[in-house]
């Protein structure tokens, strides 16, 4: 149980950190032309620009993923201290929150990927996904692993019973 909880805490912390970095950086998409290159993220800087709906969806679900991941990691930390939290409930709440974070991040990444993938290419400009985009996908995988490990910690943990009264 301790190994599962420790690994879940490590995976959740990394997933939360990667999710925050992906959300806050602007290297999701890169375009390289004959003389210039440009990159963009989820937070366009041009004033008065019309922001596409898929960007708003990606922003919303990414923020939800960060919040769920924060809840998951918080309950994992609290479950390490039995005097602060009743035994058995921390990993279960963490499992639910981690899976919710993973699903939110997968939705955000799938929407962004499908919309960018369908954009018509320009013959003189090479476009590709950049490192912030890939960090978002890695965070989704880490959050999914956190949910599975938290579930393992919950199932392998002590059950509250008559002896705890």
From Swiss-Prot:
PROSITE patterns: PMP22_1. Keywords: Cell membrane, Cytolysis, Inflammatory response, Lysosome, Membrane, Transmembrane, Transmembrane helix. It is found in: Cell membrane; Cytolytic granule membrane. The chain crosses the membrane at residues 9-29, 61-81, 92-112, 133-153. It is a multi-pass membrane protein. Induction: By CSF3/G-CSF. Up-regulated in CD4(+) T-cells from peripheral blood mononuclear cells of patients with visceral leishmaniasis. Expressed in activated T-cells, in kidney, liver, lung and pancreas. Not expressed in brain, heart, or skeletal muscle. Expressed at high levels in TCR gamma delta-expressing CTL clones, and in some TCR alpha beta-expressing CTL clones (both CD4+ and CD8+), but is not expressed in other TCR alpha beta-expressing CTL clones and in cell lines representing B-cells, monocytes, and myeloid cells. It comes from the Eukaryota. GO terms for cellular component: cytolytic granule; cytolytic granule membrane; plasma membrane. InterPro entries: PMP-22/EMP/MP20-like, PMP22/EMP/MP20/Claudin, PMP22_EMP_MP20. Regulates cytotoxic granule exocytosis in effector lymphocytes, thus acting as a critical mediator of inflammation in a broad range of infectious and non-infectious diseases. Essential for cytotoxic degranulation of natural killer (NK) cells and CD8(+) T-cells and for the activation of CD4(+) T-cells following infection. Plays a critical role in CD8(+) T-cell and NK cell-mediated cytolysis of target cells and contributes to the cytolytic activity via the perforin/granzyme pathway by enhancing exocytosis of LAMP1-carrying lytic granules. Belongs to the PMP-22/EMP/MP20 family. This is Protein NKG7. The lineage of its organism: Eukaryota, Metazoa, Chordata, Craniata, Vertebrata. The gene is NKG7.
């Amino acid at each position: 149980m301790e190994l599962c909880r420790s690994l879940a805490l490590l995976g959740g912390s990394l997933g939360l950190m990667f999710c925050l970095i992906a959300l806050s950086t602007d290297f999701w998409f890169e375009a390289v032309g004959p003389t210039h290159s440009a990159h963009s993220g989820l937070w366009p800087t041009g004033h008065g620009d019309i922001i596409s709906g898929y960007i708003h969806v990606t922003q919303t679900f990414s923020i939800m993923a960060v919040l769920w991941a924060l809840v998951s990691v918080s309950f994992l930390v609290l479950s390490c201290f039995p005097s602060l939290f009743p035994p058995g409930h921390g990993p279960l709440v963490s499992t639910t929150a981690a899976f919710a974070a993973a699903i939110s991040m997968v939705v955000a990444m799938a929407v962004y990927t499908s919309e960018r993938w369908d954009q018509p290419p320009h013959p003189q400009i090479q476009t590709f996904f950049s490192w912030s985009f890939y960090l978002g996908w890695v965070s989704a995988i880490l959050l999914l692993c956190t949910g599975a490990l938290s579930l393992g910690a919950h199932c392998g943990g002590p059950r509250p019973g008559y002896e705890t009264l």
